[in-house]
């Protein structure tokens, strides 16, 4: 519940349409372009910093489990902490009805410590986020100003380069990061938007929302981009970065179509279960990012005009072009062409659980046999690292000497493909006991374009495996 003086201030702002100032963070207007962005009948001011009560929780490799509280108006707390000036600093900013302490941001920090030396600051603005959505939208402006104030202080007092800062924001946190980046003139090194919030931000002016000018490099993961009305998509669909990733098309994530009960029981804790059911697609963005820290190669994004084109048989978006494909998530900034243009779109498919990783291959099967058969053909890859399960390549009329091609997303990194196993079946009783085989199987890796050719000389009855070796 808001303090009475704050309610009075908001009512006054509604009538007078002026600005409110919170020193040392500057002034905040309720006029265009911030007014009525949500079709809300009242103009709103952001709450005062003391009411939002933002906490900056510093975790480092030296204190991965217990944070050190940073006071942004007293940078002696930086000197007294484990903050290291020779390391990158990653800020992780939660979104609406969320928190930064004892939640996914601190868990993400712990994963980072396994792969790098880094300062990891969780921005906990839960009091400003646990209110009605439209008010939380405006509160992001103050939180963004506070983040910018801290980064500017690090630069001024310690000569810390803003290019070494990476802002990571989920939902409303993405636009909070954008506000911070904008206040710093876009000089922050990197900004990652994890399914930036759609309501109040979609198709608004750039100064209101996340856009590519907010940092030197902006990468975005879209996972819940269906229209808010009528589909209740919480994330933006429009391109707002240098690299915009749309896993699974950016709207419906695998594993998010379960029934209410199974979703709630599947996860740790009843509250997390309810939250996961209500916003499963929206939350996938930070889960994908977190998983990418350990498994970067399993989140390769392919440049493509649309998801439909990406899913087409023998699509033109496969394999990766000469300049390569970016890795969605933690290592997206390693992509050579990351800032060559804004609004570059990339597509990929993910798994429905676990670490969500997938490796894409194009498989072409040439059949051998004596007669046409109606049924299914499947292929398993056997590699230097692991062996895959059987993947469907085609169903329908199977014709000897015909070639069937399909792109598959393998759920583990098999390494170098050393052999393949072919299987066909039709589940129909056939008194003639037909036989089919694969005379040739071509397997191409999406990442490095390498092709492997396998040959066979046999035919087999249905549900009998045929092994093909290199030729």
UniProtKB/Swiss-Prot annotation:
Gene Ontology MF term list: galactolipase activity; lipoprotein lipase activity; metal ion binding; phospholipase A1 activity; triacylglycerol lipase activity
UniProt cross-references to SUPFAM superfamilies, sorted A to Z: alpha/beta-Hydrolases (SSF53474), Lipase/lipooxygenase domain (PLAT/LH2 domain) (SSF49723)
Mode of membrane association: Peripheral membrane protein
Regulation of its function: Up-regulated by CLPS in the presence of increasing concentrations of bile salts.
One of the record's GO cellular component terms: zymogen granule membrane
Alphabetized Pfam families for the sequence: Lipase (PF00151), PLAT (PF01477)
Listed GO biological process terms: cholesterol homeostasis; fatty acid biosynthetic process; high-density lipoprotein particle remodeling; phospholipid catabolic process; phospholipid metabolic process; triglyceride catabolic process
Region annotation Required for galactolipase activity: where it falls in the sequence: 93-105, 257-279
Active-site residues per Swiss-Prot or TrEMBL entry: 171 (nucleophile), 195 (charge relay system), 282 (charge relay system)
Pathway given in the UniProt record: Glycerolipid metabolism; triacylglycerol degradation; Glycolipid metabolism
Enzyme category, top tier: hydrolase
Gene3D superfamilies assigned to the protein according to its UniProt record, in alphabetical order: alpha/beta hydrolase, PLAT/LH2 domain
Keywords per UniProt: Calcium, Cell projection, Cytoplasmic vesicle, Disulfide bond, Glycoprotein, Hydrolase, Lipid degradation, Lipid metabolism, Membrane, Metal-binding, Secreted, Signal
Glycosylation sites: 71, 355
EC code: 3.1.1.26, 3.1.1.3
Cysteine pairings via disulfide bonds: 21-27, 109-120, 256-280, 304-317, 320-325, 455-471
Signal peptide: 1-17
Matches recorded under PANTHER family: LIPASE (PTHR11610), PANCREATIC LIPASE-RELATED PROTEIN 2 (PTHR11610:SF165)
Function: Lipase that primarily hydrolyzes triglycerides and galactosylglycerides. In neonates, may play a major role in pancreatic digestion of dietary fats such as milk fat globules enriched in long-chain triglycerides. Hydrolyzes short-, medium- and long-chain fatty acyls in triglycerides without apparent positional specificity. Can completely deacylate triacylglycerols. When the liver matures and bile salt synthesis increases, likely functions mainly as a galactolipase and monoacylglycerol lipase.
Protein name, as recorded: Pancreatic lipase-related protein 2
Species the sequence originates in: Sus scrofa
Taxonomic path: Eukaryota, Metazoa, Chordata, Craniata, Vertebrata
């Amino acid at each position: 519940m808001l303090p009475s003086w704050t309610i009075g201030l908001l009512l006054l702002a509604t009538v007078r349409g002026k600005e409110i100032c919170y020193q040392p963070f500057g002034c905040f207007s309720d006029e265009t372009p911030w007014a009525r962005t949500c079709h809300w009948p009242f103009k709103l001011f952001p709450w005062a910093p003391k009411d939002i009560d933002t906490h900056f929780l510093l975790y480092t490799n030296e204190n991965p489990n217990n944070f050190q509280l940073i006071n942004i108006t007293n940078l002696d707390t930086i000197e007294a902490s484990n903050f290291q000036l020779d390391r990158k600093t990653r800020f992780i900013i939660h979104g609406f009805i969320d928190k930064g302490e004892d939640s996914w941001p601190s868990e993400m920090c712990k994963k980072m410590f396994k792969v790098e030396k880094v300062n990891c600051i969780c921005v906990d603005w839960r009091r400003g986020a646990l209110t009605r959505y439209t008010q939380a939208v405006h509160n992001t402006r103050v939180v963004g100003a506070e983040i910018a104030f801290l980064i500017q202080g690090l630069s001024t007092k310690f000569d810390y380069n803003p290019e070494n800062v990476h802002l990571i924001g989920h939902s409303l946190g993405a636009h909070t990061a954008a506000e911070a980046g904008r206040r710093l003139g876009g000089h922050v090194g990197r900004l990652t938007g994890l399914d930036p919030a759609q309501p109040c931000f979609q198709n608004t002016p750039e100064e209101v929302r996340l856009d590519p000018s907010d940092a030197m490099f902006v990468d975005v993961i879209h996972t819940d981009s269906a229209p808010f009305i009528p589909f209740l998509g919480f994330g933006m669909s429009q391109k707002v970065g240098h690299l915009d990733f749309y896993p699974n098309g950016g709207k419906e994530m695998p594993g998010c179509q379960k029934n209410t009960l199974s979703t709630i029981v599947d996860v740790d804790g009843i509250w997390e279960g309810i939250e996961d059911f209500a916003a499963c697609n929206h939350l996938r963005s930070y889960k994908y990012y977190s998983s990418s820290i350990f498994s970067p190669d399993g989140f390769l994004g392919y440049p493509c005009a649309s998801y439909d084109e990406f899913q087409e048989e023998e699509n033109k978006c496969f394999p990766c072009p000469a300049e390569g494909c970016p890795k969605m998530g933690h290592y997206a900034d390693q992509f050579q062409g990351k800032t060559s243009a804004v609004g570059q779109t990339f597509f990929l498919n993910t798994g429905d659980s676990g670490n969500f990783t997938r490796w894409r291959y194009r498989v072409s099967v040439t059949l051998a046999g004596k007669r046409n058969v109606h049924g299914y053909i499947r292929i398993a890859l056997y590699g230097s690292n692991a062996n895959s399960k059987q993947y469907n390549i085609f169903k329908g009329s199977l014709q000897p000497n015909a070639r069937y091609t399909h792109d598959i997303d393998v759920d583990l990194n098999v390494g170098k493909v050393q052999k393949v196993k072919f299987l066909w079946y039709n589940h129909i009783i056939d008194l003639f006991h037909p036989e089919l085989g694969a005379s040739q199987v071509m397997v191409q890796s999406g990442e490095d374009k390498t092709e492997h050719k396998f040959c066979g000389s046999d035919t087999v009855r249905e549900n009998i495996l045929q092994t093909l070796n290199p030729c």
